[in-house]
């Protein structure tokens, strides 16, 4: 999906095609990659040795833990979106292929970082609480929806897209982003439910499972018989 989004023509007008590429590269593609657990897969495939230890050490390093803090990952993801569509960056990238490619790489990296911080399926240094991750996902979804709605009426500064093309692209970004955020919420909910079932208290035995109670009978002394 990332390769399809980065290469080849897409249906619709110029901005609609751009929006489809944005959804593939920046949201849907990274989300699918997060669910595939790339770090876990790499650790299983690599033989024991320096490369495997180095990868695990990098994943558990303080910088990685800081980048995987959900609010930090959300700012990197949503902040880039606002900078692209509410400044002259989109117009500049239209005339500079190297800048356009750099922005697509940033979208993919920021989307992967955000999805990893929310889902936390791979082994990380510190696992954040479900409440923090869910709240961050909700706020990031709201912040993502605002520029998508504003693009319905006003294009990025310095661009001149047709009104119909602009509206279609804005709808693709709005509903595509919502669909991916719902998928991330489902992954988060399944992880919370699984952890709660695994760490929950043991089920007490019912009355039917309890052993029968018997009254202790003192031993009979033969000398007391008459």
Kindly give the residue locations of the regions a language model identified:
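Alpha-helical membrane segments of multi-pass proteins
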Residues: 1-226
């Amino acid at each position: 999906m990332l390769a399809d989004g980065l290469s080849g023509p897409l249906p619709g007008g110029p901005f609609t095609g751009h929006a489809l590429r944005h959804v593939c590269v920046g949201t849907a593609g990274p989300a699918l990659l997060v669910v595939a657990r790339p770090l876990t897969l790499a650790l299983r495939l690599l033989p024991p040795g320096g490369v495997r230890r180095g990868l695990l050490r990098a994943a558990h390093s303080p910088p990685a833990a800081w980048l995987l803090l959900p609010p930090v990952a959300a700012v990197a993801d949503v902040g880039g979106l606002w900078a692209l569509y509410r400044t002259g960056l989109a117009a500049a990238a239209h005339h500079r292929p190297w800048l356009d490619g750099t922005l697509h790489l940033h979208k993919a990296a920021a989307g992967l970082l955000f999805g990893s911080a929310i889902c936390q399926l791979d082994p990380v240094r510190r696992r954040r609480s479900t409440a923090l991750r869910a709240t961050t996902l909700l706020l990031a979804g709201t912040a993502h929806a605002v520029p998508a709605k504003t693009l319905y009426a006003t294009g990025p500064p310095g661009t001149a897209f047709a009104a119909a093309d602009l509206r279609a692209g804005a709808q693709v970004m709005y509903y595509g982003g919502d669909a991916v955020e719902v998928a991330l919420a489902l992954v988060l909910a399944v992880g919370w439910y699984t952890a709660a079932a695994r760490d929950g208290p043991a089920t007490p035995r019912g009355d039917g499972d309890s052993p029968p109670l018997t009254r202790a009978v003192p031993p009979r002394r033969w000398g007391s018989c008459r």
